[in-house]
UniProtKB/Swiss-Prot annotation:
Span of domain KH type-2: 201-285
Residues of the signal peptide: none
Protein name: GTPase Era
Family assignment from sequence similarity: Belongs to the TRAFAC class TrmE-Era-EngA-EngB-Septin-like GTPase superfamily. Era GTPase family.
Region (G5): 157-159
Keyword DNA-binding recorded: no
Region (G3): 65-68
Gene: era
Job description of the protein: An essential GTPase that binds both GDP and GTP, with rapid nucleotide exchange. Plays a role in 16S rRNA processing and 30S ribosomal subunit biogenesis and possibly also in cell cycle regulation and energy metabolism.
Region (G2): 44-48
Annotated stretches, region: G4: 127-130
Sequence positions that bind GTP: 18-25, 65-69, 127-130
Coiled-coil ranges per UniProt: none
Key words, A-Z: Cell inner membrane, Cell membrane, Cytoplasm, GTP-binding, Membrane, Nucleotide-binding, Ribosome biogenesis, RNA-binding, rRNA-binding
Protein backbone atom coordinates (compact mmCIF):
# COMPACT_ATOMS: atom_id res chain seq x y z
CA UNK A 1 0.00 0.00 0.00
CA UNK A 2 1.33 3.41 -1.00
CA UNK A 3 2.16 5.71 1.91
CA UNK A 4 2.91 9.43 2.12
CA UNK A 5 4.20 10.97 5.35
CA UNK A 6 2.69 8.04 7.30
CA UNK A 7 -0.82 8.80 5.94
CA UNK A 8 -2.44 5.86 4.14
CA UNK A 9 -3.51 6.32 0.53
CA UNK A 10 -7.29 6.13 0.43
CA UNK A 11 -9.63 5.62 -2.52
CA UNK A 12 -13.27 4.61 -2.80
CA UNK A 13 -16.70 5.20 -4.28
CA UNK A 14 -19.27 7.58 -2.81
CA UNK A 15 -22.90 7.41 -4.01
CA UNK A 16 -24.93 10.64 -3.90
CA UNK A 17 -28.63 9.72 -3.75
CA UNK A 18 -31.90 11.48 -3.07
CA UNK A 19 -35.19 12.47 -4.65
CA UNK A 20 -35.28 14.57 -7.84
CA UNK A 21 -34.25 18.23 -7.65
CA UNK A 22 -32.82 18.10 -4.13
CA UNK A 23 -29.34 19.40 -4.99
CA UNK A 24 -27.28 16.27 -5.71
CA UNK A 25 -25.62 17.57 -8.88
CA UNK A 26 -25.05 21.01 -7.34
CA UNK A 27 -23.32 19.27 -4.42
CA UNK A 28 -21.06 17.31 -6.78
CA UNK A 29 -20.13 20.43 -8.78
CA UNK A 30 -19.24 22.36 -5.63
CA UNK A 31 -17.11 19.54 -4.26
CA UNK A 32 -15.24 19.24 -7.56
CA UNK A 33 -14.81 23.00 -7.82
CA UNK A 34 -16.10 23.08 -11.37
CA UNK A 35 -19.24 22.40 -13.36
CA UNK A 36 -19.49 18.79 -14.42
CA UNK A 37 -23.05 17.65 -13.75
CA UNK A 38 -25.86 19.64 -15.35
CA UNK A 39 -28.40 21.35 -13.11
CA UNK A 40 -31.77 23.04 -13.41
CA UNK A 41 -34.80 23.73 -11.23
CA UNK A 42 -36.65 20.92 -13.02
CA UNK A 43 -36.97 17.43 -11.53
CA UNK A 44 -35.20 14.55 -13.32
CA UNK A 45 -32.51 16.76 -14.84
CA UNK A 46 -29.96 14.00 -14.15
CA UNK A 47 -30.68 10.83 -16.14
CA UNK A 48 -27.41 8.88 -15.97
CA UNK A 49 -25.07 7.83 -13.21
CA UNK A 50 -21.86 9.82 -13.67
CA UNK A 51 -18.56 9.70 -11.83
CA UNK A 52 -16.99 12.86 -10.49
CA UNK A 53 -13.44 12.22 -9.29
CA UNK A 54 -11.65 14.37 -6.73
CA UNK A 55 -8.04 13.68 -5.80
CA UNK A 56 -6.55 15.67 -2.96
CA UNK A 57 -3.24 14.52 -1.52
CA UNK A 58 -3.52 10.91 -0.40
CA UNK A 59 -7.30 10.75 -0.85
CA UNK A 60 -9.23 10.02 -4.04
CA UNK A 61 -13.02 10.15 -3.67
CA UNK A 62 -15.00 8.86 -6.65
CA UNK A 63 -18.49 10.36 -6.45
CA UNK A 64 -21.42 8.71 -8.23
CA UNK A 65 -24.02 11.35 -9.14
CA UNK A 66 -27.36 9.59 -9.64
CA UNK A 67 -30.81 10.36 -11.08
CA UNK A 68 -33.38 11.30 -8.46
CA UNK A 69 -35.38 8.32 -7.21
CA UNK A 70 -39.02 8.91 -8.05
CA UNK A 71 -42.32 7.05 -8.01
CA UNK A 72 -43.14 7.36 -11.72
CA UNK A 73 -42.32 4.03 -13.34
CA UNK A 74 -44.65 4.16 -16.32
CA UNK A 75 -42.08 4.67 -19.08
CA UNK A 76 -38.87 2.88 -19.98
CA UNK A 77 -36.87 6.06 -19.33
CA UNK A 78 -38.30 6.36 -15.79
CA UNK A 79 -37.51 2.72 -15.07
CA UNK A 80 -33.98 3.21 -16.39
CA UNK A 81 -33.38 6.21 -14.09
CA UNK A 82 -34.77 4.46 -11.01
CA UNK A 83 -32.66 1.36 -11.67
CA UNK A 84 -29.55 3.49 -12.11
CA UNK A 85 -30.15 5.28 -8.82
CA UNK A 86 -30.82 2.04 -6.92
CA UNK A 87 -27.79 0.31 -8.46
CA UNK A 88 -25.54 3.07 -7.12
CA UNK A 89 -26.23 1.87 -3.56
CA UNK A 90 -24.41 -1.39 -4.28
CA UNK A 91 -20.64 -1.78 -4.21
CA UNK A 92 -19.88 1.72 -2.92
CA UNK A 93 -17.94 2.60 0.19
CA UNK A 94 -20.03 5.57 1.41
CA UNK A 95 -23.60 6.70 0.69
CA UNK A 96 -24.67 10.35 0.94
CA UNK A 97 -28.45 10.75 1.22
CA UNK A 98 -29.29 14.36 0.27
CA UNK A 99 -32.50 15.82 1.69
CA UNK A 100 -34.01 19.30 1.64
CA UNK A 101 -34.46 20.84 5.08
CA UNK A 102 -37.57 22.73 3.85
CA UNK A 103 -39.78 19.73 3.08
CA UNK A 104 -40.15 15.96 3.22
CA UNK A 105 -41.96 14.24 0.34
CA UNK A 106 -43.17 10.76 -0.57
CA UNK A 107 -40.12 10.45 -2.80
CA UNK A 108 -37.82 11.26 0.15
CA UNK A 109 -39.57 8.45 1.99
CA UNK A 110 -38.97 6.14 -0.99
CA UNK A 111 -35.22 6.88 -0.85
CA UNK A 112 -35.17 6.44 2.94
CA UNK A 113 -36.73 2.98 2.57
CA UNK A 114 -33.93 2.02 0.18
CA UNK A 115 -30.98 3.46 2.10
CA UNK A 116 -32.05 1.91 5.41
CA UNK A 117 -30.58 -1.36 4.13
CA UNK A 118 -27.17 0.18 3.44
CA UNK A 119 -24.63 -1.66 5.60
CA UNK A 120 -21.68 0.71 5.12
CA UNK A 121 -21.21 4.34 6.18
CA UNK A 122 -24.28 6.50 5.52
CA UNK A 123 -24.33 10.30 5.75
CA UNK A 124 -27.56 12.33 5.59
CA UNK A 125 -26.67 15.69 4.04
CA UNK A 126 -29.43 18.15 4.98
CA UNK A 127 -29.28 20.73 2.18
CA UNK A 128 -30.24 24.43 2.04
CA UNK A 129 -29.68 25.03 5.75
CA UNK A 130 -28.06 28.38 4.90
CA UNK A 131 -31.53 29.77 4.20
CA UNK A 132 -32.71 29.32 7.78
CA UNK A 133 -32.76 32.54 9.78
CA UNK A 134 -33.22 30.71 13.07
CA UNK A 135 -30.88 27.70 13.24
CA UNK A 136 -32.65 26.35 16.33
CA UNK A 137 -35.61 25.49 14.08
CA UNK A 138 -33.40 22.95 12.32
CA UNK A 139 -32.67 20.84 15.41
CA UNK A 140 -36.01 18.93 15.57
CA UNK A 141 -35.67 18.00 11.88
CA UNK A 142 -32.12 16.73 12.38
CA UNK A 143 -33.24 14.72 15.41
CA UNK A 144 -36.15 13.22 13.45
CA UNK A 145 -33.82 12.16 10.62
CA UNK A 146 -31.44 10.58 13.13
CA UNK A 147 -34.35 8.60 14.60
CA UNK A 148 -35.31 7.32 11.12
CA UNK A 149 -31.76 6.17 10.35
CA UNK A 150 -29.99 5.62 13.71
CA UNK A 151 -26.75 4.40 12.11
CA UNK A 152 -26.39 7.44 9.85
CA UNK A 153 -24.40 10.61 10.47
CA UNK A 154 -26.54 13.74 9.98
CA UNK A 155 -24.80 16.85 8.63
CA UNK A 156 -26.39 20.22 7.70
CA UNK A 157 -24.93 21.66 4.47
CA UNK A 158 -25.52 24.12 1.66
CA UNK A 159 -24.61 22.64 -1.72
CA UNK A 160 -25.11 26.03 -3.38
CA UNK A 161 -23.08 28.12 -0.93
CA UNK A 162 -20.56 25.45 0.07
CA UNK A 163 -21.50 25.66 3.76
CA UNK A 164 -20.00 22.78 5.79
CA UNK A 165 -18.75 20.91 2.71
CA UNK A 166 -15.18 20.77 4.05
CA UNK A 167 -16.52 18.91 7.09
CA UNK A 168 -18.57 16.63 4.84
CA UNK A 169 -15.54 15.79 2.70
CA UNK A 170 -13.41 15.13 5.79
CA UNK A 171 -16.04 12.72 7.07
CA UNK A 172 -16.19 10.95 3.70
CA UNK A 173 -12.39 10.63 3.54
CA UNK A 174 -12.37 9.03 6.97
CA UNK A 175 -14.62 6.24 5.70
CA UNK A 176 -12.78 5.49 2.44
CA UNK A 177 -10.75 2.26 2.46
CA UNK A 178 -6.99 2.14 2.15
CA UNK A 179 -6.42 1.66 -1.58
CA UNK A 180 -4.15 2.88 -4.33
CA UNK A 181 -5.88 5.49 -6.46
CA UNK A 182 -8.00 4.06 -9.28
CA UNK A 183 -7.75 7.08 -11.60
CA UNK A 184 -4.98 9.51 -12.64
CA UNK A 185 -4.74 12.57 -10.41
CA UNK A 186 -5.94 14.97 -13.14
CA UNK A 187 -8.96 12.91 -14.27
CA UNK A 188 -12.30 14.31 -13.06
CA UNK A 189 -14.88 12.02 -14.70
CA UNK A 190 -15.38 8.72 -16.48
CA UNK A 191 -17.63 10.30 -19.09
CA UNK A 192 -16.57 11.22 -22.62
CA UNK A 193 -16.42 14.76 -23.97
CA UNK A 194 -19.29 13.85 -26.32
CA UNK A 195 -21.47 12.91 -23.35
CA UNK A 196 -20.65 16.14 -21.51
CA UNK A 197 -21.41 18.22 -24.63
CA UNK A 198 -24.81 16.53 -25.04
CA UNK A 199 -25.65 17.13 -21.38
CA UNK A 200 -24.81 20.84 -21.65
CA UNK A 201 -27.21 21.23 -24.58
CA UNK A 202 -29.93 19.38 -22.65
CA UNK A 203 -29.36 21.59 -19.60
CA UNK A 204 -29.86 24.77 -21.65
CA UNK A 205 -33.07 23.36 -23.14
CA UNK A 206 -34.43 22.60 -19.67
CA UNK A 207 -33.50 26.05 -18.37
CA UNK A 208 -34.91 27.88 -21.40
CA UNK A 209 -38.28 26.19 -21.63
CA UNK A 210 -39.61 26.49 -18.08
CA UNK A 211 -43.21 25.38 -17.81
CA UNK A 212 -43.30 24.60 -21.55
CA UNK A 213 -40.61 21.99 -21.10
CA UNK A 214 -41.18 18.74 -22.98
CA UNK A 215 -39.55 16.08 -20.82
CA UNK A 216 -39.42 13.76 -23.83
CA UNK A 217 -36.19 15.25 -25.16
CA UNK A 218 -32.70 13.86 -25.50
CA UNK A 219 -29.54 15.03 -27.23
CA UNK A 220 -27.21 13.02 -29.44
CA UNK A 221 -23.80 14.27 -30.61
CA UNK A 222 -23.37 13.41 -34.29
CA UNK A 223 -19.98 15.07 -34.79
CA UNK A 224 -17.24 16.05 -32.36
CA UNK A 225 -14.10 17.06 -34.21
CA UNK A 226 -11.15 19.33 -33.43
CA UNK A 227 -9.99 21.24 -36.50
CA UNK A 228 -7.08 23.52 -35.72
CA UNK A 229 -8.06 25.77 -32.83
CA UNK A 230 -11.82 25.16 -33.29
CA UNK A 231 -13.89 22.30 -31.89
CA UNK A 232 -16.80 21.48 -34.24
CA UNK A 233 -19.81 19.93 -32.52
CA UNK A 234 -23.03 18.88 -34.27
CA UNK A 235 -25.86 18.02 -31.85
CA UNK A 236 -29.20 16.42 -32.69
CA UNK A 237 -32.10 17.21 -30.33
CA UNK A 238 -34.70 14.44 -30.37
CA UNK A 239 -38.31 15.10 -29.37
CA UNK A 240 -41.48 13.00 -29.56
CA UNK A 241 -43.96 15.38 -31.20
CA UNK A 242 -44.03 18.16 -33.80
CA UNK A 243 -45.37 20.58 -31.19
CA UNK A 244 -42.29 19.99 -29.03
CA UNK A 245 -40.04 20.69 -32.00
CA UNK A 246 -41.76 24.04 -32.56
CA UNK A 247 -41.37 24.96 -28.88
CA UNK A 248 -37.63 24.27 -28.92
CA UNK A 249 -37.04 26.16 -32.17
CA UNK A 250 -39.13 29.13 -31.01
CA UNK A 251 -40.37 32.14 -32.97
CA UNK A 252 -38.14 32.58 -36.04
CA UNK A 253 -35.58 30.25 -34.47
CA UNK A 254 -34.83 32.62 -31.59
CA UNK A 255 -35.09 30.04 -28.81
CA UNK A 256 -32.79 27.46 -30.38
CA UNK A 257 -30.28 30.25 -31.06
CA UNK A 258 -30.28 31.13 -27.34
CA UNK A 259 -29.92 27.46 -26.38
CA UNK A 260 -26.98 27.11 -28.75
CA UNK A 261 -25.30 30.32 -27.62
CA UNK A 262 -25.48 29.43 -23.91
CA UNK A 263 -24.36 25.83 -24.47
CA UNK A 264 -21.43 26.97 -26.61
CA UNK A 265 -20.16 29.34 -23.90
CA UNK A 266 -20.12 26.55 -21.30
CA UNK A 267 -18.47 24.15 -23.77
CA UNK A 268 -15.67 26.63 -24.45
CA UNK A 269 -14.94 26.81 -20.72
CA UNK A 270 -15.16 23.03 -20.23
CA UNK A 271 -13.10 22.07 -23.29
CA UNK A 272 -10.77 25.10 -23.21
CA UNK A 273 -11.29 25.68 -26.93
CA UNK A 274 -13.25 27.84 -29.34
CA UNK A 275 -16.42 25.89 -30.22
CA UNK A 276 -18.54 25.91 -33.37
CA UNK A 277 -21.88 24.40 -32.32
CA UNK A 278 -24.66 23.41 -34.72
CA UNK A 279 -28.05 22.23 -33.45
CA UNK A 280 -30.82 20.35 -35.23
CA UNK A 281 -34.21 19.18 -33.93
CA UNK A 282 -35.78 15.91 -35.09
CA UNK A 283 -39.05 14.17 -34.18
CA UNK A 284 -38.73 10.51 -33.13
CA UNK A 285 -42.08 9.44 -31.74
CA UNK A 286 -42.16 7.34 -28.57
CA UNK A 287 -38.39 7.17 -28.02
CA UNK A 288 -38.68 7.61 -24.23
CA UNK A 289 -40.78 4.42 -23.90
CA UNK A 290 -38.87 2.34 -26.44
CA UNK A 291 -36.15 0.26 -24.79
CA UNK A 292 -34.36 -0.42 -28.08
CA UNK A 293 -34.34 3.29 -28.93
CA UNK A 294 -33.07 4.15 -25.45
CA UNK A 295 -30.19 1.69 -25.78
CA UNK A 296 -29.24 3.16 -29.16
CA UNK A 297 -29.23 6.63 -27.56
CA UNK A 298 -26.75 5.61 -24.87
CA UNK A 299 -29.09 4.81 -21.99
CA UNK A 300 -27.18 1.65 -21.12
CA UNK A 301 -28.65 -1.58 -19.81
CA UNK A 302 -32.40 -1.68 -19.66
Amino acid sequence: MAMTDSNPTRCGYVAIVGRPNVGKSTLLNHILGQKLAITSRKPQTTRHNMLGIKTEGDVQAIYVDTPGMHKANDKALNRYMNRNASAALKDVDVVIFVVDRTKWTDEDQLVLERVQYVTGPLIIAVNKTDRMEEKAELIPHLQWLQEQLPNAEVMPISAQQGHNLDALEAQIAKHLPENDHFFPEDQITDRSSRFLAAELVREKIMRQLGAELPYQITVEIEEFKQQGHVLHIHALILVERDGQKKIIIGDKGERIKRIGSEARKDMEVLFDSKVMLNLWVKVKGGWSDDERALRSLGYGDL
